[in-house]
């Protein structure tokens, strides 16, 4: 199953993604994409699909794909 960002571009592992968040931003390289409830339970996230990445502050984050912008597809 593929997931798309808010512009409808496919998000792949290794892509750089961005989302505004609480007056700042989360930006990082996609480490994993969770699409099933089983994967979500294994990775400790809820309500798949989720895109997992480490942001610029080395914090592990999980976001809904529709909230993200794939910066690699913007170039």
From Swiss-Prot:
Q: What happens when the gene is disrupted?
A: Leads to abnormal metabolite levels including decreased levels of 2-ketoglutarate and increased levels of phosphoenolpyruvate. When in the presence of NADPH, increases virulence in a macrophage infection model.
Q: Report residue spans for region: Disordered.
A: 1-24, 40-75
Which Pfam families does UniProt cross-reference here?
A: Hva1_TUDOR
Task: Name the InterPro entries for this protein.
Answer: Hva1_TUDOR
Q: Which residues form the signal peptide?
A: none
Specify residue ranges for compositional bias: Polar residues.
1-13
Q: What induces it?
A: Repressed in models of infection.
Out of the domains of life, which is the source? Answer: Eukaryota
Q: What does this protein do?
A: May play a role in primary metabolism.
Protein name (Swiss-Prot/TrEMBL): Putative primary metabolism protein HVA1
Q: Which organism is it from?
A: Cryptococcus neoformans var. grubii serotype A (strain H99 / ATCC 208821 / CBS 10515 / FGSC 9487)
């Amino acid at each position: 199953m593929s997931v798309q960002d808010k512009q409808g571009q496919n998000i792949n592992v290794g892509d750089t993604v961005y989302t505004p968040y609480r007056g700042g931003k989360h930006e990082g390289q996609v480490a994993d994409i969770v699409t099933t409830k089983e994967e979500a339970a294994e990775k400790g996230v809820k309500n798949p699909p989720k895109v997992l990445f480490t942001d610029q502050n080395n914090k592990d984050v999980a976001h809904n794909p529709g909230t993200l912008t794939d910066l690699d597809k913007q170039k």
